[in-house]
Amino acid sequence: LYAAGNHLFVTEDEGNSWKMISPDLTTNDKAKQASSGGPITQDNTSVEYYCTIFTTTESSLEKDLLWSGSDDGLIHVSKDGGANWENVTPKDCPQWMMWNCVETDPVKKGTAYFAGTRYKLDDFAPYIYKTEDYGKTWKKIVTGIPSLHFTRAIRADRKKPGILYAGTE
């Protein structure tokens, strides 16, 4: 079981103990980490705090392959169970992408899909990126999704290789 903040944690004993398995996988931009709410009461939901890992997954095909995406635009991959991490954020990705969902391909090694959004920046375009080489290169794949339907989720069909499902608003 994994849990995340700005670091990724894992438990192997049903939550009795946790081990941090990553460095900070966000931009750690202090300007984005201010307390939210008004001058009298603070917001205690933490929904306005940023620099947080929003999505993470482990590969069902490759042992020790982990992916993470943050709400401040970064994508990281680890091929050794979290001992080492590489920033593989797509070069053509707009700044401050909120990565909402990551999915590994059920049959192709090294392949992952990330769904992101920038609606909080008044950008309602869909953003889905695919890599087939562990994040070395990326391709934006949004053909067929209306231009103002921002993306929240991406899932690969486990029975029909090559079929993807996108969750949009």
Residue ranges and their predicted role:
Residues L1-E169:
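Beta-propeller blade termini and top-face loops
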